[in-house]
Amino acid sequence: MVTIRADEISNIIRERIEQYNREVTIVNTGTVLQVGDGIARIYGLDEVMAGELVEFEEGTIGIALNLESNNVGVVLMGDGLMIQEGSSVKATGKIAQIPVSDAYLGRVINALANPIDGRGKISASESRLIESPAPGIISRRSVYEPLQTGLIAIDSMIPIGRGQRELIIGDRQTGKTAVATDTILNQQGQNVICVYVAIGQKASSVAQVVTSLQERGAMEYTIVVAETADSPATLQYLAPYTGAALAEYFMYREQHTLIIYDDLSKQAQAYRQMSLLLRRPPGREAYPGDVFYLHSRLLERAAKLSSQLGEGSMTALPIVETQSGDVSAYIPTNVISITDGQIFLSADLFNSGIRPAINVGISVSRVGSAAQIKAMKQVAGKLKLELAQFAELEAFAQFSSDLDKATQNQLARGQRLRELLKQSQSAPLTVEEQIMTIYTGTNGYLDGLEIGQVRKFLVQLRTYLKTNKPQFQEIIASTKTLTAEAESFLKEGIQEQLERFLLQEK
């Protein structure tokens, strides 16, 4: 017969009581009232915060944007085809954040920082909020270091500094993306991390950019964030903030970063779509009232940090597309007023064969010569002045047939200077090469050449100086100044090459 031992039973009961873990979890839930067009209306979710992530029963994530008296408007980060009316939704208590690490370099990711290049998962131990506050006034210092784009027209007349925000604006097919990608290519060996954000573009265009960067070894220091035209509006709206969060990660670790938003017109359109579907009141051009804040809070995150924070920087090159050159539309004027200058690309110049098609007359950099080395300042002032005078004379010369010799000479010089600014795509020049090119033009060495010979001569001159007068480049690189010694080396080199070139061409 089995004997029942009371102490054994009490021990078992005591153990069970000790093992019992009474956990109470409070879950904030709601019910789907309506879903469609990337928007869901939820009843309940009483404690939800603006911008909080919510999770649907079948796994789709959304962002609570509209907090109304009797329902919550949620934008979906996916197609939401499996969400049903009456299904449950729970608030996650988190706001949108992404993992960040050095492992993202060389990868193509989407707005949620998931890889889309088929090369496996990315390991990351840290995470950053997609929307984080911009550095304050005390955290910044003024822009003083140049960020070279490799394009003569920009580096000499519309200089960009590290920590600046410079808008690239122009009609479709005027070379806006080409200017941005050339700038990325020129950062090779400059210890600058680049982030290229493609918003609402064709997948083929993004693939073309990635291939071009890979072929030239630029993907090693570049991250591509891509949300193509078929992505949900929510993800197109988030993509620039994801790019900014990745760039900030490097900026706060005392590194220099360059971020390109291509383009913000498409992000504004995605935001307009979301806002109209959420029944927010439309304003000018049917954009919502806070579309200025959409871009200002993004672009204010670009900064040159103070020495206490390690002097990291984030330079932003936002791109905006205009419709037949109309700079006074809503989005262009907004972004022009937020940025520190703009590079205006003209369809007329592009079609007449001037590439990059930069309209120097209405392009401006509000940082100015603070973002140039001394040697560039020495040669660029004269170039700017002569081109401005040439533009004025050219307009006047159309009405007059008999021009005096001085005017004819000035027009001839201007045409050669304009030729000197032309550059092929994906062929950025170093600062030293730019300085020698500008010096050759502004000091009249090209005046004796035919316009068609100018570019050929300059290519040969750059090669000749590199091999036969390396001292010139060494002096510029070490002193950052066009010294009398450097100038004499340059003059000798130009004279020698000019004689050789004229003999060849005879």
UniProtKB/Swiss-Prot annotation:
The catalysed reaction is:
ATP + H2O + 4 H(+)(in) = ADP + phosphate + 5 H(+)(out)
Keywords, alphabetical? ATP synthesis, ATP-binding, CF(1), Chloroplast, Hydrogen ion transport, Ion transport, Membrane, Nucleotide-binding, Phosphoprotein, Plastid, Thylakoid, Translocase, Transport
May I have one GO cellular component term? chloroplast thylakoid membrane
Q: Name one GO molecular function term.
A: ADP binding
Keyword DNA-binding in record: no
Give the quaternary structure.
Answer: F-type ATPases have 2 components, CF(1) - the catalytic core - and CF(0) - the membrane proton channel. CF(1) has five subunits: alpha(3), beta(3), gamma(1), delta(1), epsilon(1). CF(0) has four main subunits: a, b, b' and c.
Against HAMAP family, the record matches this protein to: ATP_synth_alpha_bact (MF_01346)
Tell me the function of this protein.
Produces ATP from ADP in the presence of a proton gradient across the membrane. The alpha chain is a regulatory subunit.
Quote the protein name from its UniProt record: ATP synthase subunit alpha, chloroplastic
